[in-house]
C-alpha cells in the first residue's frame, strides 16, 4: 500500500480505496473447486512447504465464506451448472483463478465432446495459471498476481 503522506504528528493519510484494497489482499479466502490432478498441486500450495497462509489465504469449505474460487482441473459439461451455482453463491466482491491447462482451455481433452473448453465460458476469470499440472509455485505466483490486481481496482464508485 502506498501511503501518500506521513505527517510529523504521527498521522497517516491515504485514500479509502487503497485502504480497502489493502485489507482485501491480506485476507483472500478461496473455495477450492478441485476437479482433477491440479487439485493435488493446490493442496501442496496450502501445505507447510509453500504455506499460502503467509499471504492471508485461508481455504474455506463453503462458497458463502469465500471470496476467491480456484478452478483446478478438467471442467465437464455436467459439472458446469454446478460451477456456476457455486460461483453465484459467493459474496461480492469475488474473484476466480483458473488453474491448469484443462481449466484454462480444455487442455489434453480439448476436443472431447464432454469437456468445457475453458472455465471462462461459465464464470469470469481474473487470473490464469498455466501448466499441466501447474506447480505449487505457479499457484502462489497466481495468488500474488490476483493481489496485485485487487490493489489496482477502484472500490468506491466514482462519477
UniProtKB/Swiss-Prot annotation:
- Cite a GO CC annotation: respiratory chain complex I
What the entry lists under PROSITE patterns is as follows: COMPLEX1_20K (PS01150)
Kindly state the subunit structure of this protein. Answer: NDH-1 is composed of 14 different subunits. Subunits NuoB, C, D, E, F, and G constitute the peripheral sector of the complex.
Q: Which family is it part of? A: Belongs to the complex I 20 kDa subunit family.
Which InterPro entries does the UniProt record give?
NADH_UbQ_OxRdtase-like_20kDa (IPR006137), NADH_UQ_OxRdtase_20Kd_su (IPR006138)
> Which sites bind [4Fe-4S] cluster?
37-38, 102, 132
Q: Which GO terms describe its molecular function?
A: 4 iron, 4 sulfur cluster binding; iron ion binding; NADH dehydrogenase (ubiquinone) activity; NADH:ubiquinone reductase (non-electrogenic) activity; quinone binding
* Membrane topology classification: Peripheral membrane protein
Name of the gene encoding the protein in the UniProt record? nuoB
The entry's keywords: 4Fe-4S, Cell inner membrane, Cell membrane, Iron, Iron-sulfur, Membrane, Metal-binding, NAD, Quinone, Translocase, Transport, Ubiquinone
Q: Which GO terms describe its biological process?
A: aerobic respiration; electron transport coupled proton transport
- List the subcellular locations: Cell inner membrane
Free-text cofactor note = Binds 1 [4Fe-4S] cluster.
Q: State the name under which the record lists this protein.
A: NADH-quinone oxidoreductase subunit B
What cofactor is this protein dependent on? [4Fe-4S] cluster
Q: Which reaction does it catalyse?
A: a quinone + NADH + 5 H(+)(in) = a quinol + NAD(+) + 4 H(+)(out)
Organism field = Burkholderia multivorans (strain ATCC 17616 / 249)
Amino acid at each position: 500500500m502506498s501511503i501518500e503522506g506521513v505527517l510529523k504528528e504521527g498521522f497517516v493519510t491515504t485514500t479509502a480505496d487503497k485502504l480497502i484494497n489493502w485489507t482485501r489482499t491480506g485476507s483472500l479466502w478461496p473455495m477450492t473447486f478441485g476437479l482433477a490432478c491440479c487439485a493435488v498441486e493446490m493442496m501442496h500450495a496450502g501445505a507447510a512447504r509453500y504455506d499460502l497462509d503467509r499471504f492471508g489465504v485461508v481455504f474455506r469449505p463453503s462458497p458463502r465464506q469465500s471470496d476467491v474460487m480456484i478452478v483446478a482441473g478438467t471442467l465437464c459439461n455436467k459439472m458446469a451448472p454446478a460451477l456456476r451455482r457455486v460461483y453465484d453463491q459467493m459474496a461480492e466482491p469475488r474473484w476466480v483463478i483458473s488453474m491448469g491447462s484443462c481449466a484454462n482451455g480444455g487442455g489434453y481433452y480439448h476436443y472431447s465432446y464432454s469437456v468445457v473448453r475453458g472455465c471462462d465460458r461459465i464464470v469470469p476469470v481474473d487470473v490464469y495459471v498455466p501448466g499441466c499440472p501447474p506447480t505449487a509455485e505457479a499457484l502462489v505466483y497466481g495468488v500474488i498476481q490476483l493481489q496485485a490486481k485487487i490493489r489496482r481496482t477502484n472500490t468506491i464508485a466514482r462519477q
